[in-house]
């Protein structure tokens, strides 16, 4: 009908969808020019991430979110009070189990999720609550660090009206007690979800059905099947640079003359036996272009001529520089040789 808004169904809380939301949040925070501009967009993105994580956590812990929605908090009656409760961790019964990591989660996400759902503040206190053992020993006995003398426990605090605070504290205690029950190896669904969240935060998450997170992101965004990429075309052999047959006349006809030359006494030329080749190999062709072809003999006019000679005369004296002349060589003339200077 006209005037009615079409309500779209929210995406299902899947790891791929959570990875897309985390990538969008990381992209927005990495752009300094857009930081703080799209306030509503950032708020909606944070709310969607919180909703997806909450639904995934509820599915993991086998708890019904519908029951939590029906049990809404009543209106506050009376003044604001502060309530707290300690839940001791069964470290002695399960000494090898990592309860601290199970309660806090990767980068504290599990504890933050519980705080957002229950409205209580959840903290791990006591011996072994700090990751740095040296720092824990240094702080032991100092003011505000008295809890280090107690056994490992979870401290739950809440501030609200009396009736609301009691309900919040009760829900938080129930949720934390579920985390204090160790699951069998390989059946801990919460641990699997925490490892998956850690992989998403580090950018190393890979879906079991897909090859890479980039492919998972593209398929989840477009909803299309993966396209098959064909292999490269076979490499063709390069074309011949020159034809095997000669393209012109012979450039060295002198070889044929030597092969058929005969001495005046009737004997064959001495070099004819050395030049005997197969009938098809009697001619030699140059494989190069014009600048590299055989050049004719150098003309005598290319050499320098003495100044005393006359060009074209019969008795022209040609000076050929077989050896390099020293540039500082002293020339001794006939008159200087007679005087000794």
Curated annotation (Swiss-Prot):
It comes from Xenopus laevis (African clawed frog). This is KH domain-containing RNA-binding protein qki.S. A motif (Nuclear localization signal) lies at residues 324-330. The keyword Nucleotide-binding does not apply. It holds the Pfam family Quaking_NLS. One of its GO terms (cellular component) is nucleus. It is found in: Nucleus; Cytoplasm. GO terms for molecular function: identical protein binding; mRNA binding; poly(U) RNA binding; single-stranded RNA binding. The lineage of its organism: Eukaryota, Metazoa, Chordata, Craniata, Vertebrata. Homodimer; does not require RNA to homodimerize. CDD domains: KH-I_Hqk. The keyword Transport applies. PANTHER family: KH DOMAIN-CONTAINING RNA-BINDING PROTEIN QKI, RNA-BINDING PROTEIN RELATED.
